[in-house]
């Protein structure tokens, strides 16, 4: 497993634990996060705040990686994954997701796009 795939493991672990306190270490200060339902999130601190808010109200979060594809140079990563969680008394199971990442020279995420 290369560096980019390890970054995904860290991020998916943060989602599962609902603890995004280490996001500033994982993303660059000017990172761009794009997802379908909101305007772009720019910067590691705004990404952290968004993910913290997004995880609020979700319990028993589970992330399953179905396919992880890392570029040979470790600068890009594609992940097909599912997410399950409980919210408002209802269980949501195996919601399909796809994420694409770009990495800066220092190994941190500088680009993240999610599809649902």
Residue spans for each PLM region:
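A solvent-exposed, acidic/Ser-Thr-rich amphipathic alpha-helical stretch
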Residues: 5, 20-75
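Short, surface-exposed coil-to-beta transition loops
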Residues: 62-64, 78-80, 93-99
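Short beta-strand edge/turn micro-motifs at domain boundaries
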Residues: 96-116
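Short Pro/Gly-enriched beta-strand edge/turn motifs at strand-loop
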Residues: 48-50, 79-84
